[in-house]
Amino acid sequence: MKIQAIETVAADWSGDYLGIGFFEDSAAIDAGLTQLDQSLQDILQDLVSETEFQGKVGEQPWTRIAGPGSIRKVMLIGLGSPDAFTLDSLRQAAAAFAKAAQKQKAASAGLQLPSWDDDAAASTQAMAEGIELALHQEIRFKSDPDAKKPGEFPQEVHLLGLANQAAAIEKAQQICAGVILTRELVAAPANVVTPSALAETAAQIAEDHGLTLEVLEREECEAQGMGAFLGVSLASELPPKFIHLTYKPSGTPRRKLAIVGKGVTFDSGGLNLKVGGSGIETMKMDMAGSGATLGAAKAIGQLKPDVEVHFIVAAAENMISGHALHPGDILTASNGKTIEINNTDAEGRLTLADALVFAEKQGVDAIVDLATLTGACIVALGNDIAGMWTPEDSLAEELSQASEQAGEKFWRMPLEEKYFEGLKSPIADMKNTGPRPGGSITAALFLKQYIENTPWAHLDVAGPVWTEKENGYLNVGATGFAVRTLVNWVMG
């Protein structure tokens, strides 16, 4: 599929499937249709009347154009109130149009939507993202060869009334390549995406896009004192991999950043085994933080900003065997702090502890970690919103702006220091879990113990990384959540 931005407007375009966006305003709808309708024998006005189209979000009537005209089918796309119009409105509208064009088997499609904030480049990028992500399908594991073929339609999409936007489309496609990589990593089962597979993915990113890669094996992790991370991997027959990808710009970097992703490729719960009804069958996606980290690395490697970025993943399985971590064991992290294990199913924070210590040693200006860390965050915020914890107001503002531009939802949560009382241990520096109330807060407070002076934020993405329901450019399954926010943060 080829996406192009062209100066031609809807009234002059010819092709199989035309989509036109309208705000919720009957006068504007009438005025917008007048010129185009002159060549279509008032078909569009009839469509508006028959379907009672008002321009509301979700309204998408279409009709076939009879006769030998230059357009075969037309779709009207409701955009809602102009006051609520955002870049994500463009993504959603473009996604709906792309899926409709695919369903109608349109070889050529033309889409005309208003620009957001008179910013043609940002608007073009958002539309291209919506199209690319909407048409991505997870079909790798189908046995039918025909099912594995990419969709033939549409073959080309024209973004109408926009000229000289090739760079914006290319940027969208580079970012979407990272999102799609993340989707594929998170969607794949644990017998495919192992710690070694994550390391191999990192190696491919490094080779393709000029990043440097360091992978620490178990012995090297032991030498660095990574007892928390290695404790999680004790029961697995698959070796842990500590992955460190680095992107460096050609010149002096404007700043240095670290992104740390939780990389538990399967979480059985350990000896605190996840039982029926606990969602153990979904625990292949417990590495979604690392998936987003590698997806962001792929995108950043193509975009090549003037920022140095360290992408860090401590990859391991949390399994059961005679060598497994016991409840009551004490682990020592690489900063010397000791941890009493009172729940082996709170393992992600253990891997992140050593990863955060390692990240700070890189001398970066800020660190962001992301993880499917707690079910408590889903209870608090639902499946569509991720939690954000940081003591730094400026970093919180950076991430909020980046997420708003991406159309990904985060909500800043409190780092209530009083709650750390629940993590105190009589025999070690801390326990790895606290009481049930405020579970996502105590998890963030645990991670805070492994940061000394660097500005840091923790993102709990447990809810939004997966969806059971199609929604706009999000198809059922892995969503690729947080990649676009991370990219915007780095580029900002």
Curated annotation (Swiss-Prot):
Q: Which cofactor does it need?
A: Mn(2+)
- Sites binding Mn(2+) 2 sit at K262, D267, D286, E347
Main localisation, per the record?
A: cytoplasm
InterPro entries (alphabetical): Leucine_aapep/pepB, Macro_dom-like, Peptidase_M17_C, Peptidase_M17_leu_NH2_pept, Peptidase_M17_N
One GO cellular component from the entry? Answer: cytoplasm
For molecular function, the Gene Ontology terms on record are: manganese ion binding; metalloaminopeptidase activity
Give the UniProt record's GO annotations in the biological process aspect: proteolysis
- Cofactor binding notes: Binds 2 manganese ions per subunit.
Q: NCBIfam families in the record, alphabetically?
A: PRK00913.1-2, PRK00913.1-4, PRK00913.2-3, PRK00913.3-5
- Please state what the protein is called: Probable cytosol aminopeptidase
* The species this protein was found in: Acaryochloris marina (strain MBIC 11017)
Where is the organism placed in the taxonomic lineage, from the top? Bacteria, Bacillati, Cyanobacteriota, Cyanophyceae, Acaryochloridales
